[in-house]
A protein has these predicted regions:
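N-terminal leader/targeting and accessory segments in enzymes
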Residues: 1-34
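Phosphate-binding loop of NTP-binding sites
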Residues: 24, 30-126
């Protein structure tokens, strides 16, 4: 089963994608962020939010290497730290996750609030 959040439905979508669900919304980025925020609400584990001008990925990978021998670590893949990458990263949380490491990067003023609401960090690293 595949699921899509879209602003415009594809032509002939039910025939072209018989095993898929489509959720039509006004703003797909906003919908993805709110869905990820609700998903994050389901987990009561330590969540480390990592931000800053440089070094986010290196710090995340370093912490993952330190923690992974003793815990199941869920982390942002590669440099998924954007308005779309963060929600996709948070979707990786599952019942096996014991700690999460998520990067948050911004490209313009005001973006960090949305990322903070999605990540809901219990620990912050700048």
């Amino acid at each position: 089963m595949r699921n899509f959040v879209v602003e415009t439905l594809p032509h002939n979508y039910s025939a072209s994608y018989p095993d898929a669900n489509f959720l039509k919304v006004v703003d797909s980025r906003e919908a993805l962020q709110r869905l990820a925020e609700r998903h994050r609400d389901e987990f009561q584990i330590p969540v480390v939010g990592i931000t800053g001008s440089n070094g986010k990925t290196i710090v995340k990978e370093w912490l993952s290497q330190l923690l992974s021998p003793d815990m199941v670590v869920t982390r942002s893949p590669r440099s998924y730290n954007s308005q779309i990458g963060v929600p996709l990263s948070v979707w990786l949380l599952d019942e096996q996750s014991e700690v999460a490491l998520f990067e948050a990067g911004i490209s313009k003023p005001g973006e960090m609030q949305a990322l903070r609401d999605i990540i809901q960090p219990t620990i912050g690293v700048l």
